[in-house]
Amino acid sequence: MNIEKIKKYTKTPIYYYKEINSTHVYGKQIEGQGDAILIAEAQTAGIGTKGRNWHTGENKNIAMTIIKHPNVKIEKLNGLTIEIAKKIKKIIKEMYDYNLEIKEPNDLMLNGKKISGILTESHTRGENVAFLLISIGFNVNETEFSEETKEIATSLKKEYKKEFNREEIIIKIIKNIEEIIEQL
């Protein structure tokens, strides 16, 4: 992955890991250091829906967490996860003309199978947001799924039989999420 290319599109510091347990878990540990974007090639214990494991194959998918400190009232975050899902759906439509479906509260589906999950978590001080974690897992070039997930998960490559540029998708996701946060 060309992290230097991604860094050109944001002022937020980006930290890149070949392997990490979970960008979300690590994001909670380092949030005191300021805004950041964590991107991993592989996760050994990614967090999915209801705390389930989200597998991230090495060099194949997107596993990232955006850490922000928006200093807004907690009410401003109502509907944030769905708004992010709508943006990602729009990104994929504009880039590839593929139609993702949103499965509330936090999944994106392609042809009836899960392709992406969004996990948002906020911590408050009083009535204001102290920090916000936005974690995104997106199956881009994965073709091999576990027995447990092969019937319910998919990827762009599995569906369309070609490689996709993860950096371009990441750049668009970051730009769109940063715009959402700025407008809170």
Regions found by a protein language model. Give the residues of each.
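Short loop/edge segments at beta-strand edges and connector loops
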Residues: 18, 102-104
